[in-house]
Amino acid sequence: MTTKTTMTEHVAAYLAERSMLGFSISGPGAQLLKSFAGFADGQDCGTLTSDLVIHWAKDQSRTSHPFTWAGRLAIVKPFAAYMTRLDPATEFPATPIFGKSRRRLTPHIYTDGEILGLLAAARALQPQGELRSAVFETLIGLIAATGLRISEAINLRCCDVDIEACCATVRMTKFQKSRHVPFHRSVAEALGSYLQVRGRFVRQEAEQAFFTVAGGQYLNKRTVHGVFQRLRAAVGIVPRGSYPHVRIHDLRHTFICRRLERWQAEGCDIDNAIAALSTYVGHAKVSDTYWYMTGIPDLMAIAGSRFEGFALGENGHV
């Protein structure tokens, strides 16, 4: 007699296939998918149905909010597509019955004065003139100047930063891809100054962490966030976005917004510019970059003004 394959076994096979294709299977999404499989097996349901997945998404959630339920449905959706290859009777809700599964909150956009204040506060970290102050001043400056993710910056190795070529190589990023990130000569000069300080405390080796405070070890992300919050408090920066706290990641948002603001003001071909910027900052989808045009009030105002000019025949393009 043939033994029926359980939903847990189907999920394990699906995750193994995703892993072979280079996708991460260790995040919260994988754990939620395993939770769904366990629930389905407990219901003795051999087939994935709309009723089953809705029941799990809503009634098995710890949060009574449609946004959370929609997110749980979104986790199962790719797996449901996979299951249709194995079981034609597989069902999944055809419409987003709980609404959108993703929402983007407006980030804090730093002023130039706030960024300069953060750099000055980092430079004043005790003991002054030591590696710690140089690390945090340079780290904050690099993220502000290039829009790197914090994880990308702290995972740089010495061999990844080519100061002469003004380019950093970011390896195996958030989406398991690598990319080159060119930077301005002024950034190269700041990085070179940092390396001179670093060299007094740590021997430079190609495979060592570029940003390090002890023994060539990589910075801990939690430590970086903790130090940043102390610097933010020292400067007196208060949040202007939708988040309750100002974050170091907002430096990345600020870089993207300032670049788009400049291109908008200069009347550039914004579609081509956004495509290039999306690649530069490592967005998985160009739509993630377009979001800033509608999600940031300052950019919306510029875009609206340009569209008004276009409608009145003052501009050749929007």
Map each language-model feature to its residues.
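Conserved catalytic core of the tyrosine transesterase superfamily
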Residues: 1-318
